């Protein structure tokens, strides 16, 4: 009961005070950006939390029941043994692979791999060859056509051809000679570890889990290789974002941290280095976000009545300004994909080395300020990056070197080869430096837990 009251107070106080805060914004030194009032947003957030509480309540009942049959859970894979046995036939098997540390880069030597995946919703009722060409952009269309014609792609264990259409529930199997992109060789720092969870400081430039072209150059696979067992991520960080990550070592750890994050019982703070002179007063952005292009992970500010729109709110405070860039503390009150990056772009202060949201060749001179952009043009230009053009940003405006096609093919699979990644491919000046429980120890004001990293070097003014 005491816990519920604390949660209720956390979200009802802003609702009661929202109108007064809005009236006093100028005198209090606050700036608001958004169409919806704080009142409307906080009411939505409270409803979201209440729904999540009900979900967690039902989950806890199921957990209590499952404790009576502990052998039903496979602790090494976090799966029900019954479900796991049904999927055993389709389990993704890892081949042997070799790691090479080449100065600042961690490389994986090319290896043979059987890629297995079930049909995604956006692939339904589309030709297999069209999905390969549009979704997996690291290879040219002729490679995929040749691979399908050679019989190296199967749908539900049957050989596919160029006319094959993917249906809901289809299992796609693709035999491939895999070339993973290099990632940074910076070490993964462990901040905290017990029997159930591990808290790490994730380096920039490494994906969290296998996705797209990455498998063994990912946080979960690196740790699995070092630890000898599976760890599951509890919070999300973009590939380029660095900072605090929670990884569950057991189902108990996954449930504990996951439930707190979903119920908004965690305060998160980031630090970013942005373009220009950020306002000295606190800035609050309440603008919905939506995914514009899944292949490019492109997100944008939108109206709440648009399909796919999600409420989003971020609080910003300037730490310092050096005449060109500002160091800003960012506090997301929701956890939408690219939320901080897009809200900063909306304000006209994108992250200074952001290869997506601070590239003037893509967004024009205003860098997408106010959400103003022709997204058909934006998507077309972003599509060229990493193939014909290296990634660039406001800070690295000349582009310089980076990952592009190098006009050379693999002697084994004849796929196009790429140059090594550059600074815009590996680094982003956005760092998650603090995660803290919103709840306190009984009878004290001390938070139940708090994890913190040092500021990254780029955030330290000399």
UniProtKB/Swiss-Prot annotation:
Organism: Saccharomyces cerevisiae (strain ATCC 204508 / S288c)
EC code: 5.4.99.28
Gene3D superfamilies: Pseudouridine synthase
Molecular-function GO terms, alphabetical: pseudouridine synthase activity; RNA binding; tRNA pseudouridine(32) synthase activity
Top EC group: isomerase
Residue positions of the active site: 238
Range of the transit peptide: 1-24
Other facts noted in the record for this chain: Present with 639 molecules/cell in log phase SD medium.
Full protein name: tRNA pseudouridine(32) synthase, mitochondrial
Family listed: Belongs to the pseudouridine synthase RluA family.
Biological processes annotated in GO: enzyme-directed rRNA pseudouridine synthesis; tRNA pseudouridine synthesis
GO cellular component, one term: mitochondrion
Function comment: Responsible for synthesis of pseudouridine from uracil-32 in mitochondrial transfer RNAs.
Swiss-Prot/TrEMBL catalytic activity: uridine(32) in tRNA = pseudouridine(32) in tRNA
Keywords assigned by UniProt, alphabetized: Isomerase, Mitochondrion, RNA-binding, Transit peptide, tRNA processing
Domain S4 RNA-binding: 127-188
Subcellular location: Mitochondrion
